[in-house]
Each structure stands twice: as C-alpha cells, then as structure tokens.
Amino acid sequence: MEDTKQRILEKSLELFSTKGYDAVSVGEIAKAVGIKAPSLYNHFPSKQAIFDAILETTSAHYQKDTAEISVHVQDSQKDIPVFSHISEELLVEKVRQIFLYSLHDKTISQFRRMMTLEQFRSPKFAELLSKRYVDWMISYDAGIFRALVANGELRNEDPDTLAWMYVSPIIVLLSVCDRQPEREAESLAKLDAHVKLFFRTFNIVGGEK
C-alpha cells in the first residue's frame, strides 16, 4: 500500500509540473499510476490531500538533502560556523552545490515548475513560490550576514539589503535554467562570477574596507 501511495505522489507531481495543478484530474492521476480512480481514494480523500502530502514530503526531502551540505534554510544560526571565515573558493563550491541540487533534483525541480505554472492562476501558489524561493532564502542569508557583520567579517552594511543583493541573481539564474536548460553552463559561469564579486566586495580581510 505504501508503494502505491508513493507512486500516486510521484505521478501526481509529474503531471502537476507539466500541466498545472488545476488541469489534472484525479482520474488522470489514477490512470498514470495504473489503478482505477475509486482505488485512489483508498489512499487519499481528494486531490488537495495529494497536494498537501506532496508539500510535506518535498519539504522534508529538501531539508534532509540540504542539511547534508550544511544549509539549514529555516535555521541559519546552525550554519554560521560553516560560513565564518569561509574562503572564496569554498563559498563558490557551496553555492554551486545548492544551485545544482535545486536545478537537477527531480522532486525539487518538478515542485518548482508546478508552482511556477500555477503562480498566476492561484494566489495560494504565488504565495508558496515567493515563500520557498524568495522569503526563506532572503531570511536565511540575512541571518548569516547579520552574524558575519557582527563578527567583523563583512562590511557594516544592512544584512537584509546584502541578502537581496546576494540572492536575487541566483534566483534569476535558476529561472533561466528552468526555461532554457541549454544555458546551464553559461549560468554557472555567471553564478561563479557573482559569488566571487560579492565576496571580494563585502568580505573584510585584515580590517574594515
């Protein structure tokens, strides 16, 4: 039964990411899974319940995977020791890791595409997309920068503004790769250049700049 439930979640997300949430029926999901529509209700009472389960499992999946590379999006305090006195090369490597993971992990990529498709049709999806791919990232990096400014490792600038400057190009490059996968190499080069410039502009080495 658990295998069937997992297949329902996987096939639903696949369909939602290509056609949009509203355009997919329960019958279509059941057909993709290889079961009859009434059987699907033995596992989930509604399409909304399927979406809620996808949201929960995707969030857990993301938090587990990113924690392995010391990125705790909802608790930046855990990662301050990782980013304190980090080298330019290591910072570039870590940003590349999270960027490539977000781009190529099947579950995360499909979930982002689903939200992107639905953002203009549903205020709920628009809010969720902003929360996951803007608000959380800004809050996370602002928390890191706030600690580094206090420690004298970053220039004494507003941490929230620094976070917006840092995160915005990354979000743009991710969206470019979603729309045009053939531009991945170009986007990675731009990502590296952005992180290096930010590091050299705001990092303090041997005193205030």
Locations of the language-model features?
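Short, basic, alpha-helical segments at the C-terminal edge of helix-turn-helix-like DNA-binding modules
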Residues: 56-62, 69-70
